[in-house]
Structure formats: C-alpha cells, structure tokens
Design a protein with these regions (language model features):
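Substrate/cofactor-recognition hotspot
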Residues: 1-244
Length: 244
C-alpha cells in the first residue's frame, strides 16, 4: 500500500471499526492524491458519515475515537474530562472534532503520510463561540428545564453573536416565552428560577421572601425580572461568558 492508502486504511479502522472496502479505498485515495481534499476534509468525511453516526457512540467513546485517530494515543484522563465537560455544556461534536484535527499531533500524522493537513470550516452559529453556546444552553436548562434543540440553539447563538440580542434580552426571551409561561410557576418558584439564572445560586430565605412580597404587593414579573437581570451578579456571569 502507498502511504496515502495507509492513511485511508487507518481511518477505516479507527473511525468505522472495519477494513477498507476496495471501492471506498480507491475513491478516498483519489481524492487525496489529486489534492482535491486535505487530510482534515477526508477525516471529516469519515466522522460525519452515516456509517459512523450509526455506531451511536457515547461522548466518552466518541472522544476515544478522536484521541486514537488524531492524536495517535489513548486519552489522558485530565484532557478527556475537559472535553467531556465541553460536550456536556453544549459544545457540539463538530467543534470538538475541529480541535483534534487542527492539533499539532494530527499535523505530524499527516506529514508522516505525506499529506497536507488542511482545516475544518464550521458554519453553524453554535460552533462559532463556545462561550456563547454554553450561555444559551444554560438558559435552556435553568429556564426551561431541558436541553437545547439544535435549531433553537443556533437561533439564539446567532442573535447574540450578531448583536441582535444582549444577554439580558436573550434571557428575557426564555423567561417570557410561551414554553416558560406554560409551566405556570407560582411566585415563589418564579423567583427561585431567577436566582438560578441571574445569581447562579439557590435563593436565600430572606431574599426569596422579599421578592415574593414585591410580587404580592402588585408589582409585575417583568419588574422583578429587571431587578435580577440588571444585577451585578448577572453582569459577572456575562463577563465569565464574554458577552454583554
């Protein structure tokens, strides 16, 4: 086998967990030899393939494949748990894949096989800024009590990235959404939710009592929302995520 063929055979083995079929091996070899695609793009073809997706790997197993394929080693526990944490907080597998493919290690692997590494272009809004993505996922979890759906996540990330929404406006979009309203929260539960979203903690007894009283005395939920959303605590949360 030529070095390019060996590179492809390695992808079949590591990513698809099987031997290369003749026609597949020929087709991918052609693509690389002709310079039509880089090592990164061919790897993307394998990682994004229907066959790989059908393996339905857990995040942990997915990362093991990336470590073996692109870093040529077993995962170290510190590195792996950092990536697991990223995935758990809404960073997409595509974004993590890009991190592995654009590593020094994979650059080395490609040059070993005489291949140009190249880069990966991520086009979805949720893949443009990991911190913005994490902020939006946090809103889904704390306000709506669920994980983000892909189109919603892309929509909110886009609104924040393009400056169409500030962090406060995005949070308002969740708190005053039909989905949130359908939860029919009592004043107490409403205030508890605001503490989690804007203070990053559970409500303390005195604070909870004071805010519930404000509502009982006829103030609107919007008024209370503003009190939380304009707080120093929420500003600090936004700073942490690098958003305004």
């Amino acid at each position: 086998y030529t070095s390019v063929q060996q590179f492809i055979i390695r992808l079949y083995k590591n990513v698809l967990n099987r031997d290369a079929d003749v026609s597949g091996l020929d087709a991918w070899t052609q693509v690389l030899v002709s310079g039509r695609e880089s090592g990164a793009k061919v790897s993307e073809g394998f990682i994004y393939s229907k066959e790989f997706k059908e393996r339905q790997l857990s995040d942990s197993d997915y990362l093991d494949v990336l470590y073996h394929t692109f870093l040529n080693r077993d995962a170290d526990s510190a590195g792996k748990s950092e990536w697991m944490n990223q995935l758990a907080n809404g960073v997409s597998r595509n974004s993590v894949f890009k991190g592995f493919v654009e590593s020094d290690e994979f650059t080395g692997i490609c040059s070993q096989y005489g291949i140009i590494r190249g880069n990966i272009q991520l086009t979805e809004p949720r893949d443009q800024n990991d911190n913005v993505t994490k902020f939006v996922v946090r809103c889904y979890r704390l306000c709506l009590g669920r994980d983000a759906d892909e189109s919603g996540l892309n929509g909110w990330c886009n609104a924040i990235l393009t400056g169409q929404n500030t962090a406060k406006e995005a949070a308002a979009g969740f708190v005053f959404s039909d989905e949130f309203k359908k939860k029919n929260l009592s004043d107490t539960e409403y205030v508890k939710t605001l503490y989690r979203v804007f203070m990053d903690r559970e409500a303390d007894g005195a604070g909870l009592e004071a805010w519930v009283k404000v509502l009982k005395n006829g103030q609107t939920r919007e008024h209370v929302f503003n009190g939380f959303a304009d707080s120093n605590e929420f500003r600090e949360i936004c700073t942490r995520y690098g958003i305004k």
